[in-house]
């Protein structure tokens, strides 16, 4: 989950929508990424985060490969400079 900076020209909603567009565009382009879906927060509150990514991988190795894939790294760089806070949870079904 990401919470974006509030002191930018872009609003957090604009950043979240652009991140959604970029991450979901990776579907079908990175081996091992079965599905990437971004949810954008629909209700503003002080404790709410702005966006969440749900991504499915067939293995931990596929997740590791995704993290360093050049197409993903471009999105990471876009988000990193706009991010106030980020948390993640990796779990196995």
Named regions from a protein language model:
Residues 1-50, 58-65, 91-93:
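Short S/T/G/P-rich N-terminal loop/turn motif that feeds into the first structured element of a domain
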Residues 60-85:
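C-terminal structural segments of small proteins and small subunits
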């Amino acid at each position: 989950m990401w919470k974006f900076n509030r002191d930018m020209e872009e609003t957090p909603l604009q950043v979240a929508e652009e991140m959604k567009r970029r991450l979901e565009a990776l579907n079908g382009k990175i081996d091992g990424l079965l599905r990437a879906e971004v949810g954008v927060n629909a209700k503003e509150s002080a404790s709410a985060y702005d966006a969440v990514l749900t991504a499915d991988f067939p293995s931990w190795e596929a997740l590791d490969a995704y993290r360093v894939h050049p197409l993903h790294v471009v999105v990471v760089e876009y988000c990193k400079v706009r991010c106030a806070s980020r948390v993640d949870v990796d779990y196995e079904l």
